[in-house]
């Protein structure tokens, strides 16, 4: 037993590395300490062992989560340090920390850094990191939905079939293309670069982009002016390259893409293209030194240039043969001229561009412009003729004559000589016009014309029933006169229904609102229908017309429903009925207009008038509700006439059949104009336009306010009595009333 106790005591002493007064040296990672009056070697903090023979480092990092969340532990001799993982930082801003110093790891918001994701991208912070997403209209270069800057991804523009509708997309593509070809300063190389790009498969946005570059880029046209190469062949090559480039933009296989554009946008870009083609051709040709002729012929574009000096001017007759026809320029004769002058005459022929410039969207209330008939089509090539002379008065145009073959037979149709009329400062309003041109001969296959100015020419075909210029002018005067008279009559009606207390009733309330709606519609029409120079203002006017005309229709419908309720003798609550009448009369048109605008706001306002475009059948957002209301009114009309006929026959059995029919006819006529069934002529004019439907529709609707005044006020016995009371105290008026 004593031996066992001795062994235990020795073991304890050894474990404490007992030596008298630590006579045995302690290890470097140990220190001598007195415990219970006994000196011994003990390992320092962070180490374990007997202090004499061994002191091993303690790996604190083996302990789970010793550093807390979002941190990693790093063991050191006699201790450890904590570091925040990527995407986190210490709360105290230190690089490293220990758990007992009050620090912890918190998320770093990388999105606070400007442009951390690069161009056209947005940053989204996440716990311990962030993700990048491309903005609308862009996608990652690697096809990923999200990315980080260090994975090699970046945002690039999405070029798709709908991109042409977005201005930002076009602008971005133009800038990108200019950056790529901008460093090229040599003219032929630049034209060749654009031509080479146009030879590849093109999207609509590519075509529009290159047209904008040709139109707006000063690098091309400016360098043309500064080029001094003496080689005419050099510039001939430039003209060839340029002609092929334009051809690639207008050849037939691009028409399907062009058709994707709204009519006004398509016309705008084609106008820019034709203007740029004419301008650049003249600019290049100015550098040709010799008297020469240049021809270029491609699939859908032909080009011919005459360059001559004043010495050869009398013997040069600029002309161009055009696919079975020709075009010829005749200058004014002069007795004296500058012997050092020079002249350039350029012709371009676009063989297939005509259908893209045909008219399609100019219908409103039966009125059509003399410059753009409702169903006109281009049935020939489009030719361009331009002159540049130095000095400018050296070679002035007297006339241009041309004969063009028809691409379609013109049987039972009339042809017209026309030119593409546009302003260089505003190319949005390009349209066909016949001003300054006259037809000299026409048959089923060819038409000959003579014009007094230069631009782009073509032959138009329109149905023989189309409205002629004289008819259009007459219709315009009828519309203006009728609306002015109607406004006066409607103003009298509004005054009558508003201020004559003796006639106040539900029916006069309906009449008052109907007259107000129609008054505002016709006032906006008279003032703003032709304010088409500002697209935004024109769209607002079209929207107001859409709303007020629909409101007038709604109150017309209410009139029919109310008369039906009276005739059939249904019992109704007056207050409830009035409330619902106002809701239907003013809210339902607003719903229709709002819904239509949300689906196709760009169809409010055309290049001709501030009305709804017929493109994509958008005009039916007005005609549809109008037809529905007309149908409801016609049904109510039938019931009312039937009831009135029976009622009249029952009350006056002694009245002859003629008088009975006349009584019914008077009421029928009143309802016919009052309830707007004359708008049926408008629908007929849309479906089958003719001079007859145009006159019927224009007269019946322009004077609708006058008809309302006649039937609601003049022929009303009660209102006659009110007018008598009003004017009987006025001597001059009383004598007239006697």
Curated annotation (Swiss-Prot):
Residues 292-467 form the GAIN-B domain. The keyword Transferase does not apply. One of its GO terms (biological process) is cell surface receptor signaling pathway. It is a multi-pass membrane protein. It comes from the Eukaryota. InterPro entries: EGF-like_Ca-bd_dom, EGF-like_dom, EGF-type_Asp/Asn_hydroxyl_site, EGF_Ca-bd_CS, GAIN_B, GAIN_dom_N, GAIN_dom_sf, GPCR_2-like_7TM. Residues 1-19 form the signal peptide. Keywords: Calcium, Cell membrane, Disulfide bond, EGF-like domain, G-protein coupled receptor, Glycoprotein, Membrane, Receptor, Repeat, Signal, Transducer, Transmembrane, Transmembrane helix. Disulfide bonds join 22-32, 26-41, 43-55, 61-73, 67-82, 84-105, 111-123, 117-132, 134-155, 417-449, 437-451. It is found in: Cell membrane. Abundantly expressed in heart, lung, and kidney. Less evident expression is observed in brain, skeletal muscle, liver and spleen. No expression is detected in testis. CDD domains: 7tmB2_ETL, EGF_CA. It holds the Pfam family GAIN. Residues 502-522, 569-580, 643-666, 716-738 are cytoplasmic. Glycans are attached at residues 62, 112, 175, 226, 297, 421, 429, 443. Proteolytically cleaved into 2 subunits, an extracellular alpha subunit and a seven-transmembrane subunit. GO terms for cellular component: cytoplasmic vesicle; plasma membrane. The transmembrane domain is not required for cleavage, but it is required for dimer formation. Heterodimer of 2 chains generated by proteolytic processing; the large extracellular N-terminal fragment and the membrane-bound C-terminal fragment predominantly remain associated and non-covalently linked. Endothelial orphan receptor that acts as a key regulator of angiogenesis. This is Adhesion G protein-coupled receptor L4. The gene is Adgrl4.
């Amino acid at each position: 037993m004593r031996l066992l106790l001795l062994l235990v005591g020795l073991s304890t002493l050894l474990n404490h590395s007992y030596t008298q007064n630590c006579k045995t040296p302690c290890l470097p990672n140990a220190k001598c300490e007195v415990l219970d009056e006994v000196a011994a070697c003990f390992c320092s903090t962070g180490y374990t062992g007997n202090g004499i023979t061994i002191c091993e480092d303690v790996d604190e990092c083996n302990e789970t989560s010793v550093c807390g969340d979002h941190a990693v532990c790093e063991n050191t001799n006699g201790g450890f340090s904590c570091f925040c993982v990527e995407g986190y930082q210490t709360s105290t801003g230190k690089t490293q920390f220990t758990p007992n110093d009050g620090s912890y790891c918190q998320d770093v918001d990388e999105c606070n850094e400007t442009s951390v994701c690069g161009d056209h991208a947005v940053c989204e912070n996440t716990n311990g990191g962030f993700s990048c997403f491309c903005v609308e209209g862009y996608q990652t270069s690697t096809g990923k939905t999200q990315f980080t800057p260090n994975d090699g991804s970046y945002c690039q523009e999405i070029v798709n079939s709908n991109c042409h509708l977005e201005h930002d997309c076009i602008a971005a593509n133009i800038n990108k293309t200019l950056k790529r070809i901008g460093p090229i300063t040599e003219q032929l190389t630049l034209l060749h670069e654009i031509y080479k790009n146009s030879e590849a498969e093109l999207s609509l946005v590519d075509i529009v982009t290159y047209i904008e570059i040709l139109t707006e880029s000063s690098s091309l046209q400016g360098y043309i002016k500064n080029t001094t190469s003496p080689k005419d062949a050099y510039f001939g090559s430039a003209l060839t390259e340029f002609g092929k480039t334009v051809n690639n933009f207008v050849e037939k296989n691009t028409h399907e893409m062009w058709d994707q554009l709204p009519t006004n946008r398509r016309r705008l870009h084609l106008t820019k293209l034709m203007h740029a083609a004419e301008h650049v051709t003249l600019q290049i040709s100015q550098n040709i030194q010799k008297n020469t002729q240049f021809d270029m012929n491609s699939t859908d574009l032909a080009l011919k240039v005459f360059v001559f000096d004043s010495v050869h001017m009398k013997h040069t007759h600029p002309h161009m043969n055009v696919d079975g026809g020709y075009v010829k320029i005749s200058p004014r004769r002069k007795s004296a001229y500058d012997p050092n002058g020079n002249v350039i005459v350029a012709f371009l022929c676009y063989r297939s561009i005509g259908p893209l410039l045909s008219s399609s969207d100019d219908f409103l209330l039966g009125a059509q412009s003399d410059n753009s008939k409702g169903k006109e089509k281009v049935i020939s090539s489009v030719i361009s003729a331009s002159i540049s002379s130095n000095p400018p008065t050296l070679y002035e145009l007297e006339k241009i004559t041309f004969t063009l073959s028809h691409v379609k037979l013109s049987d039972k149709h009339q042809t017209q000589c026309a030119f593409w009329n546009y302003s260089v400062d505003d190319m949005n309003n390009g349209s066909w016009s016949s001003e300054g041109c006259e037809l000299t001969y026409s048959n089923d296959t060819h038409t000959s014309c003579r014009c007094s100015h230069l631009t782009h020419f073509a032959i138009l075909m329109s149905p023989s029933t189309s409205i002629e210029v004289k008819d259009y002018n007459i219709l315009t005067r009828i519309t203006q006169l009728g609306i002015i008279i109607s406004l006066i009559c409607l103003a009298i009606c509004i005054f009558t229904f508003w201020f004559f207390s003796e006639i106040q009733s539900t029916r006069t309330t309906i009449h008052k609102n109907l007259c107000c709606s129609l008054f505002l519609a016709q006032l906006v029409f008279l003032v703003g229908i032709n304010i088409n120079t500002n697209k935004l203002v024109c769209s607002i006017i079209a929207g107001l017309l859409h709303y007020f005309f629909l409101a007038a229709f709604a109150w017309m419908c209410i009139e029919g429903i109310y008369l039906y309720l009276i005739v059939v003798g249904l019992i109704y609550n007056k207050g409830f009925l009035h409330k619902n009448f106002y809701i239907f009369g003013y809210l339902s048109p607003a719903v229709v207009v709002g819904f239509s605008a949300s689906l196709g706001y760009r169809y409010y306002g055309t290049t001709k008038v501030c009305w709804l475009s017929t493109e994509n059948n958008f005009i039916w957002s007005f005609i549809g509700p109008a037809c529905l209301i007309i149908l409801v009114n016609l049904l109510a009309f039938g019931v009312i006439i039937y009831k009135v006929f029976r009622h009249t026959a029952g009350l006056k059995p002694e009245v002859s059949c003629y008088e009975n029919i006349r009584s019914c006819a008077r009421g029928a006529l009143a309802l016919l104009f009052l309830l707007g069934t004359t708008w049926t002529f408008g629908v007929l004019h849309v479906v089958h336009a003719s001079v007859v439907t145009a006159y019927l529709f224009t007269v019946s609707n322009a004077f609708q306010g006058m008809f309302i005044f006649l039937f609601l006020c003049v022929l009303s016995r009660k209102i006659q009595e009110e007018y008598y009371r009003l004017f009987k105290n006025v001597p001059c008026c009383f004598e007239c009333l006697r």
